[in-house]
Design a protein with these regions (language model features):
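Extracellular adhesion/carbohydrate-binding repeat motifs centered on closely spaced tryptophans
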Residues: 1-165
Length: 165
């Protein structure tokens, strides 16, 4: 049974059939929850670091798997099938590529900006809305662009490679 507001601070707890509070990972009605000891779970979308992995949780501590969502104003992230927050270059449902930095949030460079991540060069387009509250700059794909007098071929993964004559 998932109970709310036991301590008056809008936190959520899980009690087993005997009424004992459960903490840590809890499965209830085929959903996975994480109840932080001793504070309980929050009634909002949030991130939590557990054993050196960052997980995405929804209201009441429900683990959000394969989810792309806002976690606050202008903070947008994506989780994998285990609820772990993804970083690096990720293709969203709009079929565009975006870069999520190691601090989790979507990177939004200025339109036309170049950036190097993990030894690879990328070019970013004008920021667009990816959700009601967040904007992201898609990574340019499948084109050729000029930078500092050099020609770069950008592949389907957004990686720019200098064109050799």
């Amino acid at each position: 049974m998932l109970s709310n507001d036991i301590d008056g601070n809008y936190k959520y707890y899980y009690a087993d059939k005997d009424g004992h509070l459960q903490f840590g990972w809890v499965t209830h009605n085929n959903e996975t929850y994480y109840i932080s000891p001793p504070w309980g779970a929050e009634n909002r979308t949030y991130l939590k670091n557990i054993n050196e992995k960052t997980y995405l949780f929804g209201p009441k501590g429900r683990l959000l798997r394969n989810t792309a969502t806002d976690i606050s104003w202008d903070d947008f992230c994506v989780s994998d099938e285990n609820g772990v927050v993804k970083t690096g270059v990720i293709r969203l449902e709009d079929n565009r590529l975006y870069y999520f930095n190691p601090e989790i949030y979507m990177t939004t460079p200025l339109s036309g900006e170049w950036a190097e991540f993990d030894g690879k060069l990328y070019h970013f387009e004008m920021p667009i809305s990816v959700s009601p509250y967040s904007k992201g700059s898609p990574i340019t794909t499948n084109t050729t662009l000029e930078k500092d007098g050099k020609t770069y071929i950008i592949d389907e993964n957004g990686v720019a490679t200098e064109k050799k004559d």
